[in-house]
Amino acid sequence: MTKKTIYFICTGNSCRSQMAEGWAKQILADDWNVYSAGIETHGVNPKAIEAMKEVGIDISNHTSDLIDNNIIKNSNLVVTLCSDADVNCPSLPTNVKKEHWGFDDPAGKPWSEFQRVRDEIKIAIENFKSR
């Protein structure tokens, strides 16, 4: 069976989309190719790396990438993770489905916010898998 492609997008491809990519590569790997990107690039947030490391997922080699139109047009699903990405997401081909899963931005917030958002993203991806 050919894998589908899911593309997670947030503002800076720094926290939320990086954590979503890390979780999805673990949870959805059998059925989905997983990518993430941002409207801008802010670099991968070190606290996002640490938050994922805490649950045994290594995203330290991830890079902060701009949206790639080739990945978009070959995606089955684009998931925006913040309102900025939802509003500024490039127009999608008609065959690409889009969903918005809004999460708070943990950047600049206490460590507990990174943990909370990380865990909320995991739950959303697990719920998506069980659909």
UniProtKB/Swiss-Prot annotation:
Using the UniProt record, give the first listed, main subcellular location. Answer: cytoplasm
Keywords, alphabetical: Arsenical resistance, Cytoplasm, Disulfide bond, Oxidoreductase, Redox-active center
GO CC, sorted alphabetically, is: cytoplasm
Keyword Lyase in the entry? The reply is: no
Among SMART domains, the record links this protein to: LMWPc
Q: InterPro entries from the xrefs?
A: Arsenate_reductase_ArsC (IPR014064), Ptyr_pPase (IPR023485), Ptyr_pPase_sf (IPR036196)
Which GO MF term does the entry hold, naming one? protein tyrosine phosphatase activity
Q: Name one Pfam family in it.
A: LMWPc
Q: Say if the entry is tagged with keyword Oxidoreductase.
A: yes
**Disulphides:** C10-C82, C82-C89
What is the catalytic activity of this protein?
arsenate + [thioredoxin]-dithiol + H(+) = arsenite + [thioredoxin]-disulfide + H2O
EC number of this enzyme: 1.20.4.4
The positions flagged as active site in the entry are: C10, C82, C89
User: What biological processes does GO assign it?
Assistant: response to arsenic-containing substance
Gene3D superfamilies listed in its UniProt record: 3.40.50.2300
What is the superkingdom listed in this entry's lineage? Bacteria
Where in or outside the cell it occurs: the entry states: Cytoplasm
**What family is this?**
Belongs to the low molecular weight phosphotyrosine protein phosphatase family. Thioredoxin-coupled ArsC subfamily.
Function (record text): Catalyzes the reduction of arsenate [As(V)] to arsenite [As(III)].
Q: What is this protein called?
A: Arsenate reductase
This protein's gene is called arsC
